[in-house]
Design a protein with these regions (language model features):
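Sequence/fold signature of self-assembling virion shell proteins
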Residues: 1-54, 191-289
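Long, hydrophobic/aromatic-enriched structural stretches that serve as scaffold segments
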Residues: 32-99
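Short, charged/polar micro-motifs that form catalytic or ligand-binding hotspots
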Residues: 70, 95-103, 172-175, 179
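A general secondary-structure signal for short beta-strands and their flanking turns/coil
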Residues: 77-79, 177, 261
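Alpha-helical scaffold segments that mediate packing/assembly in large oligomeric complexes
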Residues: 81, 85-164
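Helix N-cap / beta->alpha transition motif
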Residues: 87-91, 184-188, 278
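Residue-level signal for secondary-structure boundary elements
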Residues: 114-117, 121, 169, 173-176, ...
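Extended, solvent-exposed, turn-rich assembly/linker loops in the middle of proteins
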Residues: 132-205
Length: 289
């Protein structure tokens, strides 16, 4: 029975991978490590808080010695999970006759767990709904463009995006050589995409030009319509931020070995934590409408 449940769980895992790749938004925004092992419960990393200025002299002996100011950060690694049940007869049919697995319940549970993981990466981890134990990309941004901006009026989005990138530039981030992404609420995303001038010119091409080949990305309703952020694309952003993955999404059967009736219980889970190494590489926008 235990071996059958284990094999059943593996088959479910195979069915979960492809659908989850389509719905996981947070992992598409940052570089993701290979799974490091579920037994890892916390991780240390260096967070750059200040970089010393360069020196100009006629020899290396005439300048002062400075150090990069970095703070060692330790974070617990949260687990994202959701329980599910599969009809007992479906399991028995698979075990005895090799019929196809109905993975609908497990996939639904995986979507629920993925939504929680997305919220952790995009916004942060909070237990009380107010205070963030672990900062996500929005909450952990080192810059804040808070000028009131009404989207949908031609030119406003361009002005706001340029202002946010300007703040990152002033903080020492080489924005002119980085591919950037602008991540917005789903409502703002569609409003921006349809914005045109009185002459019918779309605003989107101007925005994409500012992003150096990056994208306008919808993160759904994880952020409110007033919230957005700009950050380096995952292809170039690993020095600034990454997602430390300890366990990729997988299933774990919970039905006891001796149980022969009742539905098959299981759990879908993953584990990982966002590591913001240089928060100035992210600029949030907090006053959009």
């Amino acid at each position: 029975m235990v071996n059958a449940l284990t094999e059943f769980s593996k088959k479910l895992d195979e069915k979960l991978v492809s659908p989850l790749r389509q719905v996981l938004k947070g992992r598409k925004l940052v570089s993701v490590t290979s799974p490091q092992g579920f037994g890892i419960t916390n991780v240390d990393w260096g967070k750059i808080t200040e970089m010393s200025g360069g020196m100009v002299s006629y020899s290396f002996t005439s300048g002062n010695t400075d150090q990069i100011d970095a703070t060692l950060v330790n974070s617990k690694i949260p687990v994202y999970w959701k329980d599910y049940e599969i009809d007992r007869r479906i399991f028995e049919g698979w075990r005895q006759r090799g019929i196809d697995i109905d993975a609908a319940n497990a996939i639904a549970a995986a979507y629920a767990a993925a939504k929680v993981e997305d919220a952790a990466i995009i916004n942060g981890v909070t237990n009380d709904g107010t205070n963030y134990d672990i900062l996500g990309l929005y909450q952990g941004a080192g810059n804040d463009y808070n000028t009131a901006t009404t989207l949908g009026t031609f030119g406003n989005a361009t002005t706001a995006l340029a202002g946010a990138i300007n703040l990152m530039d002033d903080a020492g981030i080489p924005v002119d050589s980085l591919k950037l992404n602008w991540c917005v609420n789903s409502s703002a995303y569609h409003k921006i995409r349809r914005t045109r001038s009185a002459q019918g010119q779309l605003e989107l091409p101007d925005l994409l030009d500012l992003l150096n080949g990056g994208e306008l990305i919808s993160v759904g309703t994880t952020l409110t319509t007033a919230q957005a952020f700009v950050l380096p694309d995952s292809s170039v952003g690993e020095p600034y931020v990454d997602y430390y993955l300890t366990a990729d999404f997988q299933t774990d059967p919970k039905t006891p070995e001796y149980q022969t009736t009742g539905n098959i219980g299981g759990r879908v889970f993953s584990a990982g934590v966002l590591r913001i190494k240089q928060d100035d590489a992210i600029c949030r926008m907090s006053n959009l409408s």
